Amino acid sequence: MAQTITSLADLKQGPGAEPAGLSAEPQEPKLDKEGRAYATGKRKDAVARVWIKPGSGKIIVNGRDLGVYFARPVLRMMINQPFSIVARVDQYDVMCTVSGGGLSGQAGALRHGISKALTYYEPALRPALKAAGLLTRDPRVVERKKYGRAKARRSFQFSKR
């Protein structure tokens, strides 16, 4: 029983009017038994496992305070970016373990993980974080070294004679 559609209004009224995945009901938070949201963030070679829960804004990285682990203010600002974008500064405690890569990659992985964990804890924050580009994994990684070259793109020094 195929229904003929003559206008866009008929298309809206059809049986499949609402696209899949776009339901009007709010999403439910993904929490563990202890009431924490868990997410994994990645950047370059670094991987961050992040747990967030409501608290006073304390961030623990590998058992150390944020200011001790990330001494550079730029990295600390980068890590706190998801909270400032959604106006949740000092409302969540973060406990995370970071491994691999350098400090900059680890800070990027931590920012990615915090953003994902925030969306799991409060799904309503997803559009703001997505618009800021914090939920997208940065695909840039180190280019591999090629044979016949000194590095990925640099050639060996040329000697005319």
UniProtKB/Swiss-Prot annotation:
GO molecular function: RNA binding; structural constituent of ribosome
Gene Ontology CC entries for this record: cytosolic small ribosomal subunit
Location of region: Disordered: 1-38
Biased composition (Basic and acidic residues): 27-38
Transmembrane segment boundaries: none
Xref: InterPro entries: Ribosomal_Su5_D2-typ_SF, Ribosomal_uS9, Ribosomal_uS9_bac/plastid, Ribosomal_uS9_CS, Ribsml_uS5_D2-typ_fold_subgr
Biological processes, Gene Ontology terms: translation
The UniProt record lists the keyword Ribonucleoprotein: yes
Pfam family, one: Ribosomal_S9
Record bears the keyword Ribosomal protein: yes
Intrachain disulfide bonds: none
Database matches in PROSITE patterns: RIBOSOMAL_S9
Keyword set, alphabetical order: Ribonucleoprotein, Ribosomal protein
HAMAP family reported in the protein's UniProt record: Ribosomal_uS9_B
Similarity comment: Belongs to the universal ribosomal protein uS9 family.
The name this protein goes by in its record: Small ribosomal subunit protein uS9
Organism per entry: Rhodospirillum centenum (strain ATCC 51521 / SW)
